[in-house]
Structures are given as C-alpha cells and as structure tokens.
C-alpha cells in the first residue's frame, strides 16, 4: 500500500478539505488544549475564510512522493509511513500558525502525536476494545476466585451500614450452610454431620475423618516425635505442641483476655480464665440485680422494717444497693458495649460481689476475752481456772479508727485488733506470759471502767450485740488471765462438784510457766520464761523416760503421756496460785476487789487441797501439820536454784518446768507449809517430805521410815504398782544434779505414779538416809523383776 492510496482513502472519509481542516483543528483545541467552544467556533470561521485550493495540496503531495521514493530502498515501509506523516503534519502546523490570530498561536503549541492517534482510529478496533472492556470484569472475577484463600477477609458493607462477610465459595453444606471452595472440602466436612470416619488405625482401631489425623495418630504407636525443642531437648508429635512448649522458655503470652486484658500462654488457659472469672461474674451480677430489685420494691411499697427484723444486715444492704445501681446502668448497654466496658466493672467484682462470704469473713473475728486491767484480776480469779473459750465478737466499723489509741493504752495482745484479723477468723489463744507481763503496765482507770459493768464497755459501742458480747467477755475475763493454753484445774468447779472432787483433773502445766511463783514484796505478777534456767537438760529426762518405757522386764506397754488427764488423787498447783497475804500487803491489787469473795475462794480452795492431801497421805506419820498453808517465795526467782540451801529448808520449791520439758508424765506439787512435796502419777502413796521443822529428817531413823512405808502398803487393798529403777542413770548424769544444786544430790525418777529419790551412795549432806540394796528391805514395797540391781531408801 503506497502513500497515494492512503491519501485517497483519507480524503474520501473526510468528505471535504474544509471540513477536514476544521475537524483537525477542533481536535487540537478541544481534546488537547482544553479551550472553550467559543474559541473553537472562532477558529472554524478563520479557517473557512482562508482555505487552500485542492491543487496546491496535490502539488505538495507530489513533491513529498518524489522525495520519499528515493529512500524506499533504505527505509522500511512502516518507518516510511511514520516519517511521511510527521513531515506533512509539520508543514500544516506552520501554515496554521501563520494564518491564525496572534492570541491563538499559544493554544495550538501542543504535540501533534496526540492528534495523529485520534485521527487514525479504526471502527473495528474500537469495537474490539469495547468487547474487551465488557469481558474484563468477568475475567477479573474468575481470577479473584482462584487467588482467594479465606472468605473471612472479604468485608462487605450491608444496606444498614454494618459490616458483613462475603463468601464466594460455591460448595455449600446442606446441614449447616457452610461454604467451601471445592467439593473435596465439602465432602470431608459432611463426615462431621454423618459421623462417618473412613480412616482407621491398624493397631488400636481408632477411626478418623481425615487422613492426616490418622497419620498423626500413628506416630503415637511408632513413638516417632519429629519436633524437638532447641532449649530443653523435649520432643513432640505435633509442631503446635512444640511451639506451645517453647512459650514456657521464652515467657511469651500471645493470648489476651478480652475482659480484663490479662495475657496467657495457652488458649485453654484463656478459656478457663473466662469461665472461672468473667462468666461467673456475670451470673453473680444478675443475681445481685434480682436481689436489689426485691429490696427496692420493698422500700417503695412503704414497709418500714427495723434493722433486727430485716433479713439482711446494714452493710449487706448497702453493698446490694450499690450493685443494683450498677446493674441498672448495665441494663442500658447492649452486648457490644458490655464487652468493651468489662474493665469498668472489675473493681465491683473484686470488692463486693461475694456478699455472703464477705459478710461472714469481714464482719466477724474471734476475740479471746482479754484483760486490760492491773494485777487485781489475777487475785480475784485465782480459784477459777477455765479452759480457753472462743468468743465470736462482731467487729464494729468504728473500731478500726480507735485501734491506734487503744494500742497505746494497753499492750495486751488481745485488747486490740490487727488489720489481718478484720477480714478473717483469727483463732488466737491467750499467751499467758505475755498477758501477765502486760497486766503490770495497765492503767488503774481501765480497771475502774471494767468494774463498773456493761454500761461502760472497753470499746464504747451502742450496738446491742456488742453489749451482750461484753457481758460474756467479762464472764470469761478472769479465766483468760489465768490460762496458758492448757486445761488448768478449775478449783471453783471442783469444790462444787463432788464427782470431780473425787477424781481431780490434773493440770498440764506449760513449759513457759513455773508453779506457784508469786512475789510477796512486790506483787506485780511477772512470770518469766524458764527456758534459760531449765536446770535439768531435756536429753537427761528423755533418756530417763526411754529407760523406763523400754526396760526389758515385760512392761513395755506402760507409757507416759501428757494427754492422760485421768490422773486421780493428784494435786494441781497452778502458776496463778494466790499467796496467803493480808490485804494491806497486797500492793498491786485493785481497791474495788471484794475481800469477802477472796476469802470464800481461798476457803474453798483450802478445803479442796486438804481433802486431796488427806487422801494421798492419810497414813503418813510425817505429815505433822493438819492445816494447809500457802507458799510465799522470795523475789529472787531468776537467780534461785531448783533446790534451796539446807540451812533454810530441807526440801524447797522445785520448778515444775525442770521436769516437764523431757517427761510426758506431768509432775504435781503439793504446798505444805514452806515447801512442796513431790507427788506424781496415780499412786495414793507418794512420799511428801513435809516436816514442819528444818531438821525433821534427823529425828527419824531409817528403819522407822521403811517400817512405816511397809505397813502402809499392807494396809491398803490396792494392787502394788511396779516401780522402775534405773541404776545406770546415776553415773553419767550425776554431775548435773549434784553440781548445779546447792544442797541435795539425789536422783529423781517417776515410776507409774511413785517418786524415788536415789543417790550413788550416802552423801555428806543427808547421812540420815543411806542407800542399801533392795534385796535386804524391799520385799513388801515393790515386785520389780530387777530388784537386785535397783536401790532405794533403806
């Protein structure tokens, strides 16, 4: 196709030269430069006035044809056509600029290539482009189908403005309307509804829906664990298990609770946390809302109920009202707002959702009857010794404000409350030593306040329950001041009950107290711990007990136990025994203490001790004093040895703690004028050394002593108790007994209620009691199988 044919076709399509000229210029003006239609009309009028004749254009074409034919051999046909049109367009552009007015020349200074592209547009090509544009959306949709993996990521906007999910998956399940990309995924999903499990394990007959589940299960039988932890070397069947395990090393917690924003390392722990905390929280909030609605309806109906007639206490009603107001606010929110605002209700849950439990725990604490008074309470209640009582005391909210002031006034461990006791049950028994130490520092004003009665309680409260509890507290106040975590001997009860008088309950004396140690000059009771002056070592006493209990004489079943409280005919001297002093000598006593009550108490106590002493020593000729006297010891207690010197007394006071720490059988002491006799166990034939004179031992011969004991044994119809002897105990432990005590070198041993005082030989201090062999004079005293090795008084 040459240039002539192309030009002829172009002229025929355009229809006229004038029309062609104007159309080309209009394309340049409107399509490229963007001028208005007014400028386009002006350009058409100028071109129509100065149009070129048809012959000039043909002559120009011939000149171009001759010049281009020379280069046809060197240039290809396509390049030749482009070059020809470019030259032609340049010539026409120059002519147009010359003929147009000066104002339109700048608007026509545009690239000619754009005009050329629009000029040579074919109709068939335009139709092809339209068809491609119609097919393009369908093709793009098919391509998106292939690339789409998860339909959950495609978001659509519904008519109401909410977001929805677009699921382009065509395979839909008939049971649950779930859509899948392929038929394979659909059929695998249908197995869940039908229950079909086509894949079976060859070893354990377990069946699975999918094949990879079967393959993963078979690794359990083969023991294959392909996934290994890099840090600790543990191996796992699944990769997920390994990744979950690695979080324990790294401390990563990727899962977060949507309510409280707490992080967890495993999904199951997140679910458990939601179930335990937040779901139960919602249920309790609903219950509280119902209760709050009932309470508000009662108040609106006009029923006036007193605080005691109301089923709920005041604090509980306040908490419930707070919850009901919170539930009214919650009811105005929808479910989406609830999830966002869960954190706002966390303080409500942590502080006051458990109404019932909080009322039981926070409102009540156990209060032991405390003593914030002086030493007069010990004297008033010396005869009454009760077991510790647990008193439920309702705590007032105002009491916590008075706590620092009360702690400054009294140092009693039970007169104040700690903060930890407010929110829980605090079962605390009275520490006797700390209580007695603090009693010496108490004020007299507090004594007066307590003696006045329930009209002025220690904690001034208008609550009726506090008043009732104060009456109970005053009832047990004296018992608490004389109690040291053991069941002591209740003298007042024993005096009024004959059955108990016949079988006196023995006192289990605590290690932290001594027996009947009261000062006569300064009567501020200060009982100090005896751990530092425990003169008999624990190892010595334990060895003694082991020797008694395991001696190879067929008596292994005899054991010494603290729990054995059925010890008859034994006298209990408690650490709070009152000395026999006149009221003028009682310096620390209260002015309001009744002397008549004290006299009655001492009289009952004396009667009981006299009866018990008569039963234990009714045939004892060495008990010269028929009356009962109380012990008054000197005030040099911490420096006083266990045995006093000989020039003062023959047998002085022996602290019970020196025997208690290593022995299971509790020792009892009997006050007799100015000393204690040693009385233990079940035997009614103990030997109290209870002469009135300090030289009573020299007045009696050894043979008379043995005759008296032998006749005493024969006169009773009671079976003879076996006395265990321990001769091997003398040598290794003689030094602690002999060196640490200033007047006696005897050995002590308890044998089923009897006391034997033994020594390695006749000592210089007690020449009146020589030691002889048992086989000479012991025929009527004991039936021990090891009589040849034991020694006793002769």
Curated annotation (Swiss-Prot):
Main location (coarse class): nucleus
Region: Disordered, residue numbers: 298-336, 574-596
InterPro entries per the UniProt record, alphabetical: C2H2-ZF_domain, Znf_C2H2_sf, Znf_C2H2_type
Intracellular or extracellular location(s): Nucleus
Protein's GO biological process: cellular defense response; gamete generation; negative regulation of DNA-templated transcription; negative regulation of gene expression; negative regulation of transcription by RNA polymerase II; positive regulation of transcription by RNA polymerase II; regulation of transcription by RNA polymerase II; substantia nigra development
Family: Belongs to the krueppel C2H2-type zinc-finger protein family.
Assembly notes: Interacts with HNRNPDL. Interacts with the 5FMC complex; the interaction requires association with CHTOP. Interacts with CAVIN1.
Entry-linked PANTHER family: C2H2-TYPE DOMAIN-CONTAINING PROTEIN-RELATED, FINGER PUTATIVE TRANSCRIPTION FACTOR FAMILY-RELATED
Protein name: Zinc finger protein 148
Organism: Homo sapiens (Human)
Gene name, Swiss-Prot/TrEMBL: ZNF148
């Amino acid at each position: 196709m040459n240039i002539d044919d192309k030009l002829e076709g172009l002229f025929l399509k355009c229809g006229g030269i004038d029309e062609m000229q104007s159309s080309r210029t209009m394309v340049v003006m409107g399509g490229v430069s963007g001028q208005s239609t007014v400028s386009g009309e002006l350009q058409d009028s100028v071109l129509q006035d100065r149009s070129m004749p048809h012959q000039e254009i043909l002559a120009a074409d011939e000149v171009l044809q001759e010049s281009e034919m020379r280069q046809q051999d060197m240039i290809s046909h396509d390049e030749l056509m482009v070059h020809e049109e470019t030259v032609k367009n340049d010539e026409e552009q120059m002519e147009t600029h010359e003929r147009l007015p000066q104002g339109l020349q700048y608007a026509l200074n545009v690239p000619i290539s754009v005009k050329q592209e629009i000029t040579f547009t074919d109709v068939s090509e335009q139709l092809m482009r339209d068809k491609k544009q119609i097919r393009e959306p369908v093709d793009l949709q098919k391509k998106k189908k292939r690339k789409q993996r998860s339909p959950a990521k495609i978001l659509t906007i519904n008519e109401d403005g909410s977001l929805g999910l677009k699921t382009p998956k065509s395979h839909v399940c008939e049971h649950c309307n779930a859509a899948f990309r392929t038929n394979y995924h659909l059929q695998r999903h249908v197995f869940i509804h039908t229950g079909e499990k086509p894949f079976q394990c060859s070893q354990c007959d377990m069946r699975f829906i999918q094949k990879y589940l079967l393959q993963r299960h078979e690794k359990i039988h083969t023991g294959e664990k392909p996934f290994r932890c890099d840090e600790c070397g543990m191996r796992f069947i699944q990769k997920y298990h390994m990744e979950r395990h690695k979080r324990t090393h790294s401390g990563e917690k990727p899962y977060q609770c949507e309510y409280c924003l707490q992080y967890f390392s495993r999904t199951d722990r997140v679910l458990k946390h939601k179930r335990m905390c937040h779901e139960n929280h919602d249920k309790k909030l609903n219950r509280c809302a119902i209760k709050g609605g009932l309470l508000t309806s009662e108040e609106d109906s006009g029923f006036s109920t007193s605080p005691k007639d109301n089923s709920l206490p005041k604090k509980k009603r306040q908490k419930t009202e707070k919850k009901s107001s919170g539930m009214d606010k919650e009811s105005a929110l929808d479910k989406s707002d609830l999830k966002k605002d869960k954190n706002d209700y966390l303080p409500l849950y942590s502080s006051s959702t458990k109404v019932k439990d909080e009322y039981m725990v926070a409102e009540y604490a156990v209060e032991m009857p405390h003593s914030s008074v002086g030493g007069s309470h010990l004297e008033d209640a010396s005869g009454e010794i009760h077991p510790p009582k647990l008193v439920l005391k309702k705590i007032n909210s105002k009491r916590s404000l008075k706590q620092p002031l009360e702690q400054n006034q009294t140092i009693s461990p039970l007169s104040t409350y700690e903060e930890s006791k407010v929110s829980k049950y605090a079962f605390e028994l009275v520490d006797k030593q700390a209580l007695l130490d603090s009693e010496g520092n108490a004020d007299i004003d507090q004594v007066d306040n307590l003696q006045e009665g329930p009209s002025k309680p220690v904690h001034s409260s208008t609550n009726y329950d506090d008043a009732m509890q104060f009456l109970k507290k005053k009832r047990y106040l004296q018992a608490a001041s004389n109690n040291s975590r053991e069941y002591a001997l209740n003298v007042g009860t024993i005096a009024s009950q004959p059955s108990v008088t016949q079988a006196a309950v023995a006192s289990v004396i605590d290690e932290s107290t001594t027996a009947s140690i009261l000062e006569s000059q300064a009567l501020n009771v200060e009982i100090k711990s005896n751990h530092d002056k425990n003169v008999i070592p624990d190892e010595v006493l334990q060895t003694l007990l082991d020797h008694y209990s395991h001696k190879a004489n067929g008596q292994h079943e005899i054991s010494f136990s603290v729990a054995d409280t059925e010890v008859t005919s034994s006298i209990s001297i408690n650490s709070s025994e009152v000395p026999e002093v006149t009221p003028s000598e009682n310096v620390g006593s209260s002015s309001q203490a009744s002397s008549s009550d004290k006299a009655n108490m001492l009289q009952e106590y004396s009667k009981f001790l006299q009866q018990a002493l008569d039963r234990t020593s009714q045939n004892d000729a060495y008990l010269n004093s028929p009356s009962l006297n109380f012990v008054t010891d000197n005030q040099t207690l911490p420096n006083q040895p266990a045995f006093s010197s000989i020039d003062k007394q023959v047998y002085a006071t022996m602290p019970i703690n020196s025997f208690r720490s290593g022995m299971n059988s509790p020792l009892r002491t009997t006050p007799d004028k100015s000393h204690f006799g040693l009385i233990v166990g079940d035997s009614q034939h103990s030997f109290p050394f209870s002469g009135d004179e300090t030289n009573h031992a020299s007045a009696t011969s050894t043979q008379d002593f043995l005759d008296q004991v032998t006749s005493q044994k024969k006169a009773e119809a009671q079976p003879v108790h076996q006395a265990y002897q321990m001769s091997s105990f003398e040598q290794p432990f003689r030094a602690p007994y002999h060196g640490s005590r200033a007047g006696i070198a005897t050995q002590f041993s308890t044998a089923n209620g009897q006391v034997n005082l033994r020594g390695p030989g006749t000592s210089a201090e007690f020449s009146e009691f020589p030691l002889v062999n048992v086989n000479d004079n012991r025929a009527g005293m004991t039936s021990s199988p090891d009589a040849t090795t034991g020694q006793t008084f002769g």
